[in-house]
Amino acid sequence: MKNLTLENIARVCGGTYYGPADKLQEEVMSVITDSRKAEEGCLFVPIVGERVDAHKFIPQVMEAGALATLSERVLDNADFPYIAVESSLQAVKDIAEFYLKQLQIPVVGITGSVGKTSTKEVIASVLNQKYHTLKTQGNFNNELGLPLTVFRLRDGDEIAVLEMGISDFGEMTRLAQIARPDTCVITNIGTCHLENLGDRNGVLKAKTEIFKFLRPEGHIVLNGDDDKLITVKEYEKIKPVFFGMSNECQVYGDKVVSRGLKGMTCTIHLGDTAFTVDIPMPGRHMVYNVLAAAAVGNIYGLTTEQIKAGIESLEPISGRFRMIETDKFLIVDDCYNANPMSMKASLDVLQDGAGRRIAVLGDMGELGENEVQLHEEVGEHAGKCDIDVLICTGKLCRNMAERAQRTNPNLKVIYEPDRESLLEHLEGYVQDGDTILVKASHFMKFEEVVTKLENM
């Protein structure tokens, strides 16, 4: 890893090196926090968690061939190199910031209330048509996950597409300091993490912290149909590029046609050029993700042919609108996370399903003092949708179920108090030929519901 010598690591994280002097100039081969991934030449960063203190794994990591380890305490009688630091978490962020600077490659930072992951996937797919692109994997988008993503970069990578997720003020500033993006993309401002951020104005303030470490002559790409983002006129003399359905946006879409659960077709207008794309994922919200990707592709010099190819070769990922066909059902696996905006969008897509259309929904978390009202609003939306069965699970989802039934007395609404009860009764609620949407916040562990359906 470029310039990641033990000497540089100790210096950038303010640590004290203990060990043989002849090891100081050796470069680490990888940086890990999971002791099970120990390999020859790695640097181990033991994180102190709520349940596990990873310092206890230091001996086995060193035995597996690690070059060195960080440690928040002095290790008496250690016969291996280590760097004593005040905080392993802060150290790993400092090291990641240093390492990314050494590589000197463009960085696209992506945030927003809804659609971060899908937008990241499309942008990476587009950029990969011209550049060797590294993207965030899974949910590695927080103060630990972002550094670990950065450490996956190697000399052959030409651009990084980094997802940045937050739940409180100040977090984005810390993430942006590591990433220092050339291009900042904000998908939208919704009702997420209101427990800490208060309201949508708070969400806007927290998300736009990403601009604080925007590199000079950088770019800002924003959703021009979002009433909060449209108020961002410029930052440090950098004027945003807006995308949306309005022809007042620099990048806009029209002639949007649904192909059911197979995807969408739309025309993208990019400057004086217009071209049609087939989006291989359903939902009008996907059009916005694609427009953001087109804007970013244009910034980095891709042709319209390359942008189109990147969009049309997109592959869905687990838990994010992935279609699973079994012998009995079509499962719409959207269970990774949920908030009111994404929940409504998923219900809209479900209406295009064949057979009985069943929504299996669970509680949404971190919504603050308006959590009951926001669940009721989703219930009202469900009641107005052309679906056949609504199954609500969780304490807060009782409010969703009740509002849905009041909105549409003809809708079959089922309430289960918890996931265990749902799993016990689920087989009796579904039948061959159903299209089944599964969606809830991550803490509800609805991937177990998807697995149950797959195995029926």
Go through each PLM region and give its residues.
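Mobile, glycine- and charge-enriched loop segments
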Residues: 35-46, 151-159, 347-368
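Short acidic-hydrophobic, aromatic-tinged amphipathic segments that line or gate anion-handling sites
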Residues: 83-87, 412-422
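ATP-dependent carboxylate/acyl-activation modules
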Residues: 110, 318-320, 443-451
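Phosphate-binding loop of NTP-binding sites
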Residues: 7-11, 91-224, 230-236, 297, ...
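Acidic, Mg2+-coordinating active-site environments of NTP-dependent enzymes
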Residues: 12-16, 71-79, 185-331, 355, ...
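Active-site beta-alpha connecting loops in nucleotide-dependent enzymes
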Residues: 51-52, 317, 335, 339-408
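N-terminal leader/targeting and accessory segments in enzymes
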Residues: 1-94, 282, 352-355, 380-381, ...
